[in-house]
Amino acid sequence: MRLTQGTFSFLPDLTDEQISKQLTYIVSKGLSANVEYTDDPHPRNSYWELWGLPLFDVKDASAVMYEISSCRKAKPNYYIKVNAFDNTRGIESCVMSFIVNRPINEPGFLLQRQDFEGRTMKYSLHSYATEKPEGARY
């Protein structure tokens, strides 16, 4: 099951050329970029691991592309994403986020149903990947 998180999640995976164009856009708008990775694909997992330091005041997209390449080499079977942060007063938020790397096999999720009083049903998601220990999921 394909993980759909981020700006381009319903499109085919971006090529390096397309990623570079998005990074050029990010840099041209004066946004800060950072690279994050995880092996826990749960939709509510918003705390991915930060790769290196955030790239503030970067003037060339190749610096961000270098960090993506380094992360891909070290974490080839992890989800890797780029975030663009706007520090403009009043915004101060992530304004763009997209996945740049995926594991070869994405096992998907188990939907768990629980019966509660009054015929109420509660649902939760469980990633099949998290059945293995952290660092050995893919």
Curated annotation (Swiss-Prot):
Family recorded in the similarity comment: Belongs to the RuBisCO small chain family.
PANTHER family on file: RIBULOSE BISPHOSPHATE CARBOXYLASE SMALL CHAIN 1, CHLOROPLASTIC, RIBULOSE BISPHOSPHATE CARBOXYLASE SMALL SUBUNIT
**Name of the protein in question:** Ribulose bisphosphate carboxylase small subunit
This protein's UniProt keywords: Calvin cycle, Carbon dioxide fixation, Chloroplast, Photorespiration, Photosynthesis, Plastid
Molecular functions per Gene Ontology: ribulose-bisphosphate carboxylase activity
Subunit info here reads: Heterohexadecamer of 8 large and 8 small subunits.
Biological role: RuBisCO catalyzes two reactions: the carboxylation of D-ribulose 1,5-bisphosphate, the primary event in carbon dioxide fixation, as well as the oxidative fragmentation of the pentose substrate in the photorespiration process. Both reactions occur simultaneously and in competition at the same active site. Although the small subunit is not catalytic it is essential for maximal activity.
A Gene Ontology biological process in which this protein takes part is: reductive pentose-phosphate cycle
What is the taxonomic lineage of the source species? Eukaryota, Rhodophyta, Bangiophyceae, Bangiales, Bangiaceae
